[in-house]
């Protein structure tokens, strides 16, 4: 299976840079020259500065309108660079990594996603977006809500990562984001690494594409890992990967249409009866009842790793909170703006023009 990672904006390019570290094909797109230069693993010839004629390489300061215009203006250059990377080999999935709350990512990702869908109709376009932390304030929340709406009409799936779930209580924001970015890549890379790999029961690219072709709905990744010698219940470990503690988004899993579970570990730990017990529970719980599974016994491993992907989700507390908060603020803002305009109009109404106060002055001077 071939996947290309395209990072957009500061958050997205940092995530893409980590994917590049673990040998994925990756591109970085940003309006900030400094952020692009900061990257460590994506080669310089795969870093694309956009919007230089608009913001001069200084970023868009979390303004998605500028981010959108930067991507639109330089889209031909971006698509040419992507075409050069794609070459003559098919791409199964384009993963677009970005931050929902930023400017370049929130504004530019929908523009690029639409262009990719048109240019590569046989490839999936999947958004991997980090939801803003509550501490970041209202502006990122509004950016996130509007971007969710736009992307849901374009991409095949939105894998939303709720940073509020992953942040530890004693971390500051910068520490949290760095650790979360690595966690996102580790989980998704673990899943992709098992696609088309020989195993007891394997997952192939068509399975993953089927699960992610979900009409712009949400998807979430679950994860659980433990030392094989310390596992008392394998079924419990697997179940943990698709319960709230293991998921990267607060969702109602019963609303999911599709599921995919990959289990990797030492052969003696992968007990069939416990695996099927857990998978049967997941099948019963999700609405779509369709579960793809892969079992990968590996005598070199000492840990059991479980990666779960649920898609076709339309019920998420994480998403609902963002959208409701954004709507409330937008209504209050628009009301305040309207009231302000009305007060200004009332205050200034009745003022004369200069010519009414100084009649004939211009004629006298001439």
Curated annotation (Swiss-Prot):
The keyword Nucleotide-binding applies. Keywords: Cell shape, Cytoplasm, GTP-binding, Nucleotide-binding. It is found in: Cytoplasm. One of its GO terms (molecular function) is GTPase activity. GO terms for cellular component: cell division site; cytoplasm; microtubule. GO terms for biological process: cell division; microtubule-based process; regulation of cell shape. It holds the Pfam family CetZ_C. CDD domains: CetZ_tubulin-like (cd02202). Transmembrane segments: none annotated. GTP binds at residues 10-14, 103-105, 136, 163, 181. Gene3D superfamilies: Tubulin/FtsZ, GTPase domain. Belongs to the CetZ family. Involved in cell shape control. This is Tubulin-like protein CetZ. The gene is cetZ.
């Amino acid at each position: 299976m071939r996947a290309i990672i395209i990072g957009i904006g500061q958050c997205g390019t940092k995530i893409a840079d980590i994917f590049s570290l673990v040998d994925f094909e990756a591109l970085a797109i940003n309006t900030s020259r400094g952020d692009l230069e900061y990257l460590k693993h994506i080669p310089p010839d795969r870093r694309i500065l956009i919007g230089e004629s608009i913001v001069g390489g200084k970023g868009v300061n979390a303004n998605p309108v500028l981010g959108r215009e930067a991507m639109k203006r330089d889209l031909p250059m971006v698509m040419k660079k992507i075409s050069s990377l794609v070459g003559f080999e098919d791409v199964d999935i384009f993963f677009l990594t970005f931050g929902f709350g930023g400017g370049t990512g929130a504004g530019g990702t929908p523009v690029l996603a639409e262009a990719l869908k048109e240019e590569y109709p046989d490839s999936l376009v999947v958004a991997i977006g980090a939801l803003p932390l509550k501490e970041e304030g209202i502006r990122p929340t509004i950016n996130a809500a509007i971007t969710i709406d736009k992307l849901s009409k374009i991409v095949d799936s939105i894998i939303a990562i709720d940073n509020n779930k992953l942040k530890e209580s004693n971390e500051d924001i910068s520490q949290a984001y760095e650790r979360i970015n690595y966690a996102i890549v580790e989980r998704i890379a673990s899943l992709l690494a098992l696609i088309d790999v020989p195993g007891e029961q394997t997952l192939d690219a068509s399975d993953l594409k089927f699960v992610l072709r979900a009409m712009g709905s949400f998807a979430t990744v679950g994860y659980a890992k433990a030392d094989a010698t310390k596992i008392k219940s394998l079924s419990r470990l697997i179940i943990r990967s698709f319960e709230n503690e293991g998921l990267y988004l607060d969702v109602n899993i019963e609303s999911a249409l599709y599921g995919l579970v990959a289990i990797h570990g030492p052969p003696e730990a992968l007990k069939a009866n416990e695996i099927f017990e857990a998978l049967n529970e997941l099948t019963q719980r999700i609405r779509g009842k369709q579960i793809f599974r892969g079992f990968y016994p590996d005598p070199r491993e000492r840990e059991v790793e479980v990666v779960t992907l649920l898609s076709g989700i339309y019920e998420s507390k994480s998403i609902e909170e963002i959208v409701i908060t954004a709507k409330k603020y937008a209504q209050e803002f628009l009301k305040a703006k309207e009231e302000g305009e009305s007060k200004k109009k009332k205050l200034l109404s009745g003022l004369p023009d200069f010519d009414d106060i100084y009649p004939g002055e211009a004629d006298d001077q001439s």
